[in-house]
Structures are given as structure tokens and as C-alpha cells.
Amino acid sequence: MWEKVDQLTPSRYSPYRFFSAQEWAAFRADTPLTLTYEEVKRLRSLGDPIDLDEVRRIYLSLSRLLYAHVEASQLLFRQRQQFLNMEESYKTPFIIGVAGSVAVGKSTMARILKELLARWPSSPKVDLVTTDGFLYPNAVLREQNMMERKGFPESYDIGAVLRFLSAIKAGMSRVRAPLYSHLSYDVLPGEYQIVDKPDILIFEGINVLQVRDLPEDGKMVPFVSDFFDFSIYIDADPRLIHKWYIDRFMRLRETAFRDPQSFFHRYSQLSQEAARSIAEGLWQNINLKNLNENILPTRPRADLILRKGSDHLIEEVALRKI
């Protein structure tokens, strides 16, 4: 894994510092554990085995690191306002981007991080928004023959993403983020999450570190990551992600897919062998292709890379040097 992150040799010239999970855990110092077992169980996604031990090993050190970054960011903002002889008229939220493949554990990580940060002594207001709501509606994707490209860069309304993040960074109140239903596998028309001047925003999705081609006319093209103060990439060997994806699909076949309102309800009626074959096809033709072409190449752009092992728990950490 690290060979692709570390493009330069010898290793001392790498833009990252590398740590084992045990080494990383030591950076927790005296950061308190503010979550309970039941809370972690409630926050984790289907098939994700994360427990309190994993929170202690990885997340408390991460919480301490982010606290330092947020404090430094706020200090710099105040100093810049003083330098410009400006009164502090609005609050600039600290935005954290969370990226990685489908089935790698982004959602669990983002939810647990949200709870930990909100329980800092300063009690910051923390919001979590996913990019799912910024997908084009299925009707639009069907019209453009893009349903099989859902999740690829062109299936997202990037303009809407940039407008949303720009409004958040500008300190605007009651900014709307469109909502998405995993039951109907579609954007919910007319339904929104209201984001009202958070201290910290966690923005999670497979595409948040992606870049676009620069226009030939030389005009400025903003990237989603331009709005981030810190970014995290959840990583694992693609063979492991493949297994987790298939396992999750088969679990959903026995649970959520059984709901008649589910977009994937038809898969619950198939035999186990037929359903597994469908899942394999979805992985090979859509998700693996998207991972290799669009998601994995963004990994070196992250400030922090969390590498998972076969048990779905984080084994290695890479932190970008400042």
C-alpha cells in the first residue's frame, strides 16, 4: 500500500509519517473516552466490527490531533482578522473531508468522529453531511443512460456541492443539503438537511478528494477539497474491500432488501447463489472500476490515511508532514 502513497525514495523524503496502530494509539495521551459500548454499536454500519478498543486505539488520538488543528485554525483566523483590521463578523467552520471506497467503513468512521468531536470540552457544534444527496436523481441518470455510472464523478452535481461548501465556509446560516434514501436508492425530492453555522462540518463521500481537468481557457476551477481544512482517506486492499462489499450485500439481502419499498427488493427473492452473482457483477463492473479509476488515485491527496486490515480494523496510519 505505502509504495503508491510514498512516490519518493528514500522514505525520509516521503510527504507522510507512518505509524502502526499501536504507535498511533500512544498519541492519545490523556484524551478521555467519551463514548459507551452501546453508542459505538449504534453508530457502526452493518458488518463493521468496530468496538471500544478500536475507538481507544485509533479515534482518540485522531480526536486529539483534530483538536490541535481546529485550535490552530481558529487562532490563525483571529490573527488574520487583526492583521486586516477587521472585526470578527462571522464564524468560519472547520471542514473535514472523509473519502474512500464503498464498503470500506467511511460512514461508521464519520459518525463516530462526529460524536467524539462534539464531546470536546468546548462542546463544538458538529454536523455531518454525505455526498449521496448530491447525486443526480435517478430520473436524470436514466435519461442520460448513466444509471450504471452511479457513483462515478459525472453522476454528481458538483456545482451544487461547491455552492453548498462555499456557503458553509462563508458562514451562511441554514444552508440546505439534499437528502438521499438508501431504501429508494434515490435523492429525496424536496427534502433537505439544514446546516446552520456549525463549528465543524464533516463532509463524507467517495468523491470528496477528486479533481477535475483544468479548462483550456485557463479559468479557475475550484475542487471540492479546496474547502477542506483536513482530509482523511479510509484505505484497504481492494481484495478485502471486495469481500466486505459482497458480505454486506448478502446481509442486506436478508434485511433491508426484504422491505417491499426497497429499490433492491428483487434481489431478496433470488437464491443465495444468484444474489452473490449479482453482487460480484456490481463489484467488478461498477465499484472496482470506480475505485481504480477515480477513488484510489485521490489517496495521496489526503492529510491522513487510515489503512484497514482483514478484520476491518485499522492497522496502519499515514500522517502528512506539515
Curated annotation (Swiss-Prot):
Signal peptide: none
Pfam families: PRK (PF00485)
Keyword Transport assigned: no
Record pathway: Cofactor biosynthesis; coenzyme A biosynthesis; CoA from (R)-pantothenate: step 1/5
GO MF term (any one): ATP binding
Cytoplasm as UniProt keyword: yes
Location in or out of the cell: Cytoplasm
Entry GO CC: cytoplasm
EC identifiers of the protein: 2.7.1.33
Organism domain of life: Bacteria
Family named by the database record: Belongs to the prokaryotic pantothenate kinase family.
Protein name (database record): Pantothenate kinase
